[in-house]
């Protein structure tokens, strides 16, 4: 008891010394060595006590943990990783964090990281290929154990990504993915979702449809357009106007352009939430009644359609489900099941009042 009280007194004196005359904290990391000095124990005993080692008595564990908590001790993760020759950090690069799809994807991955004792480092590319390359460099410098990437719309070279493959670091592409069979990819069931939307427009007897897709450079846009056209082009009395847009503002401008014409569309298909925002902004500004004057259907994560009146009919493209699938694939890759595969989530139809 005397030894513990003496240790606590030393601890209080040391903690007091970390504050200057103006009570401003002088940042000093609490180490195992410092805790050992305070308690008069060896560093190895302190370390094992904090790890709840069976060779350490309950009383000693209690003393060590109380002092560690009092001093706000935090383990040195870098030192632990160095000893274990591993780094339980995963990187995640997205074009932007804002946006319901990416938010929900990140939430799912972060949730799984927490449950599996990983940390997550999130970086934004802003759809700038140079920033994307810089982010890859940051991930390599931090020795991430694996990396999730949604490509920027302007990515035109995979050379920087291939360095991760050469270093045997698992790399999972999601949503906006590269062409080819040499990469691990997790995707929404793009083609099925687009087919479902096209079939629903036909079922609702829409005849002149403004169809808005993402950038032509993205495989996700090309796949969705191909599947959509395969359904639509079988209908000889249906006119589809296909446009590509890479931003909400561009979608807004295109929608305004088409609904300013004498022969207006009677429906709009939106390939993504980003496009849907621009479309709805324009239709509301022009006072186009939905669905009597124009129907709207979108591929969506599901949150955005619920904020409009009437609610938007959509095909679900869940970022949360995709995030869960991506993490599972990452764990499989780390278990040496790293042969490139392309996995898909399902895309259910959700009826609103907009069609």
Regions found by a protein language model. Give the residues of each.
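N-terminal helix-turn-helix DNA-binding module of bacterial transcription factors
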Residues: 2-87, 355
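Glycine-rich phosphate-binding loop signature in dinucleotide/nucleotide-binding domains
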Residues: 71, 141-143, 204-205, 258-264
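Hinge/beta->alpha junction and helix N-cap segments in small-molecule ligand-binding domains
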Residues: 95-104, 122-131, 176, 185-196, ...
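Flexible loop/turn connectors
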Residues: 9-12, 256, 260-355
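Alpha-helical recognition/docking segments in bacterial nutrient-uptake
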Residues: 2-27, 31, 85-199, 259-260
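Short helix-capping segments at alpha-helix termini
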Residues: 115-116, 167, 232-238, 261-264, ...
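Short beta-strand segments enriched in small/hydrophobic residues
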Residues: 38, 43-48, 82-98, 200, ...
């Amino acid at each position: 008891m005397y030894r513990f009280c003496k240790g606590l007194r030393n601890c209080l004196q040391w903690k007091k010394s970390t504050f200057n005359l103006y009570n401003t904290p002088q940042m000093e990391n609490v180490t195992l060595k410092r805790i050992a000095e305070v308690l008069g124990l060896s560093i190895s005993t302190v370390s094992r006590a904090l790890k709840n080692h069976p060779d350490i008595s309950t009383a000693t564990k209690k003393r060590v943990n109380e002092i560690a908590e009092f001093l706000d001790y935090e383990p040195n993760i870098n030192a632990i990783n160095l000893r274990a020759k591993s780094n339980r950090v995963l990187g995640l690069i997205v074009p932007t964090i804002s946006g319901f799809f990416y938010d929900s994807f990140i939430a799912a991955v972060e949730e799984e990281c927490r449950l599996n004792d990983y940390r997550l480092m999130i970086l934004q590319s802003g759809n700038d290929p140079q920033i994307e390359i810089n982010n890859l460099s940051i991930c390599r410098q931090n020795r991430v154990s694996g990396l999730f990437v949604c490509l920027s719309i302007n990515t035109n070279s995979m050379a920087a990504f291939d360095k991760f493959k050469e270093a045997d670091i698992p790399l999972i592409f999601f949503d906006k993915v590269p062409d080819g069979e040499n990469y691990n990819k997790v995707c929404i069931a793009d083609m099925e979702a687009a087919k479902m939307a096209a079939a629903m427009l036909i079922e609702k007897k829409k005849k002149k449809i403004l169809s808005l897709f993402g950038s032509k450079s993205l495989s996700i846009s090309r796949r969705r357009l191909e599947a959509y056209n395969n359904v639509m082009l079988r209908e000889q009395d249906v006119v589809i106007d296909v446009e590509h847009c890479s931003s909400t503002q561009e979608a807004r401008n295109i929608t305004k352009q088409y609904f300013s014409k004498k022969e207006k569309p009677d429906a709009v298909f939106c390939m993504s939430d980003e496009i849907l925002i621009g479309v709805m902004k324009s239709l509301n500004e022009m006072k186009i009644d939905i669905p009597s004057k124009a129907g709207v259907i979108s591929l969506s994560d599901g949150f955005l359609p619920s904020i409009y009146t009437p609610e938007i009919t959509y095909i679900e493209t869940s970022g949360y489900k995709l995030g869960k699938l991506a993490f599972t694939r990452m764990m499989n890759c780390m278990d040496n099941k790293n042969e490139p595969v392309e996995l898909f989530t399902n895309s259910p139809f959700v009826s609103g009042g907009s069609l």
